[in-house]
């Protein structure tokens, strides 16, 4: 398909740059580059690949940045900004909980939740480096969990998603950036292994559950009093009823 010259090419900046270097694709006819979730690309240190890609396209081109969670300070890299506003609302069928837990007990809490609640959950991490360790510890404790790290190739990612949809996996571990392309209509639960860095990210994560009129759950792990204050601020702004959920961990 690449040899035929596709009209639209979709991929991560790193992968596209790799194909350019391998001379698998030619960029001389490209007139538009779209960066979806560009704020996440910036925070994930992938933007240097974008700079490299731009050197291979014609000087006359259009660069479009798209994001649902970008901060205004990032507008300085964009000439023209268009904001599309939507109603700020939370579905009534999503229930929000928090659990106060020590950092070292987070994995054990995941294990207990998976065993007691019998649900499938998408677990969000702030740091990509934490995925592998959590996956290894959960699997050692006989929990069907896999991580969607950035180094997992597309073939295995599709396999993991199908297994998750078919109830063959219990926990799917991911960062916000890696989870962008995941679409699961019947997801029962979202777990914030780490407190989201801002309200927009919390809302985006919560929106993964409670779809198609089904009841959904959002559980956030809290390790410090300041985190609880921040979470309660999120709840106040979004008019969320936030409840404490206790779980005994040996």
Predicted regions and their residues:
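Conserved helicase RecA-like core
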Residues: 1-250
């Amino acid at each position: 398909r690449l040899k035929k010259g596709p009209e639209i090419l979709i991929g991560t900046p790193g992968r596209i740059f790799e194909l350019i270097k391998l001379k698998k694709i030619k960029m001389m006819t490209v007139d538009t580059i779209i960066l979806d979730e560009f704020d996440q690309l910036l925070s994930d240190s992938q933007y240097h690949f974008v700079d490299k890609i731009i050197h291979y396209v014609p000087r006359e081109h259009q660069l479009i940045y798209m994001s649902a969670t970008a901060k205004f300070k990032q507008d300085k890299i964009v000439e023209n900004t268009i904001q599309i506003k939507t109603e700020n609302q939370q579905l009534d069928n999503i229930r929000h909980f928090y659990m106060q837990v020590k950092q070292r007990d987070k994995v054990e809490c995941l294990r207990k939740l998976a065993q007691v609640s019998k649900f499938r959950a998408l677990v969000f991490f702030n740091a990509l480096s934490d995925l592998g360790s959590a996956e290894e510890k959960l699997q050692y404790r006989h929990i069907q969990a896999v991580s969607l790290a950035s180094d997992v190739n597309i073939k295995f990612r599709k396999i993991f998603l199908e297994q998750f949809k078919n109830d063959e996996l219990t926990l799917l571990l991911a960062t916000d950036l890696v989870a962008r392309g995941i679409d699961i209509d019947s997801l029962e639960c979202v777990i914030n292994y780490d407190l989201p860095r801002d309200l927009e990210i919390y809302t985006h994560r919560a929106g993964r559950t409670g779809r198609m009129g089904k009841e959904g759950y959002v559980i956030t792990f809290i390790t410090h009093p300041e985190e609880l204050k921040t979470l309660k601020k999120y709840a106040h702004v979004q008019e969320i009823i936030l409840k404490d959920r206790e779980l005994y961990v040996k």
